[in-house]
Amino acid sequence: MLPSQSPAIFTVSRLNQTVRLLLEHEMGQVWISGEISNFTQPASGHWYFTLKDDTAQVRCAMFRNSNRRVTFRPQHGQQVLVRANITLYEPRGDYQIIVESMQPAGEGLLQQKYEQLKAKLQAEGLFDQQYKKTLPSPAHCVGVITSKTGAALHDILHVLKRRDPSLPVIIYPTAVQGDDAPGQIVRAIELANQRNECDVLIVGRGGGSLEDLWSFNDERVARAIFASLIPVVSAVGHETDVTIADFVADLRAPTPSAAAEVVSRNQQELLRQVQSAQQRLEMAMDYYLANRTRRFTQIHHRLQQQHPQLRLARQQTMLERLQKRMSFALENQLKRAGQQQQRLTRQLVQQNPQSRIHRAQTRIQQLEYRLAETLRAQLSATRERFGNAVTHLEAVSPLSTLARGYSVTSAADGALLKQVKQVKVGETLTTRLGDGVVISEVSAVTKTRKSRKKTSNP
């Protein structure tokens, strides 16, 4: 009898795929320490080996694009530290490791600590560019924190003596390797800040292995460099060696000698610059003096040309020339004025106003006579037209018509009577005659019939 709910049934392929996804997603990337065995490298360039310890082993693969970054040749039995992803090879169901990076076991553990501390300090902002202090230019005093017996101090002092022998140097001796080295380096940095004798610090040592340089990967040293009020130049190992101190320092120099180059002035270069400036100054002075001499010569020549005696002679000559021109111009002007006077006299005689006045008076008398005659004729004609108009008006005047026996009758409202239908019995009428007005009352109204005209047939 079957149960009420059947369990999930996996195919082999689905099972291997599910396990692979669980391993990749849940485990992610891990660090593994172990011993190499069964190392092989086929023609593809990939590495295949087993990583084991005393009680267990696991198959590993490192592909060509990853193993080309490994700086050593893995050997059978070698202890290594690998960074890898856990997965499952589905066709065979084999659980295996895909290696991304590999280091010898001792250096590998240190490198892992290095990466962890680097990530931590970077997250806190100790590497940010905004906190980097500017180095003094030029430096007036240099502090060196390193071993008093190491090659790094010798290199630094040699470069400073060659480049800037007058630059003061204060040495803060300290161990640079061993368990006590980080604490001594921190105390030296703090002492330099307390004494405040120098304006830049060089912190470093010569080259060595990762273990030899490990003091400069110490968190205490990194925080002391970051807290320093004096700018710090890190100079640890060779150019390929990069420590935590290099990230925190205000400037990283690839070597101690390079750090000395950075903080010092090149006296020989300064001397060459001074000599070059002196040459430019001499050339400028020569040019200036030559220019002033040429200017003096020009001014002297102009001064000679403008000597008072020469100027007086030129002005005297100019005065005589102007005097001659003025005399000649005056004579010509007087001559032209005389000729003009003669022409005007002749014109005045020809245009004497007496004759013109006589002719004008005669003309005025003639015009006055003609005007009087014209006015008399127009007045006579006007009187005649006025008399005719008066006679005509009297002929057509209503008063003249009334004087001939006619009358005009009007009703009480002033309307002229033209027909009997306008009059009513008992109504008062006003009749105007030639010599007065008659007021009458209507006693009867009789309408006269009009006679019809007979029309004869043609």
Curated annotation (Swiss-Prot):
One of its GO terms (cellular component) is cytoplasm. The keyword Membrane does not apply. GO terms for molecular function: exodeoxyribonuclease VII activity; nucleic acid binding. Its EC number is 3.1.11.6. It is found in: Cytoplasm. One of its GO terms (biological process) is DNA catabolic process. InterPro entries: Exonuc_VII_L, Exonuc_VII_lsu_C, OB-fold_nuc-bd_dom. It is an enzyme of class 3 (hydrolase). Keywords: Cytoplasm, Exonuclease, Hydrolase, Nuclease. It catalyses: Exonucleolytic cleavage in either 5'- to 3'- or 3'- to 5'-direction to yield nucleoside 5'-phosphates. HAMAP family: Exonuc_7_L. Bidirectionally degrades single-stranded DNA into large acid-insoluble oligonucleotides, which are then degraded further into small acid-soluble oligonucleotides. Belongs to the XseA family. Heterooligomer composed of large and small subunits. This is Exodeoxyribonuclease 7 large subunit.
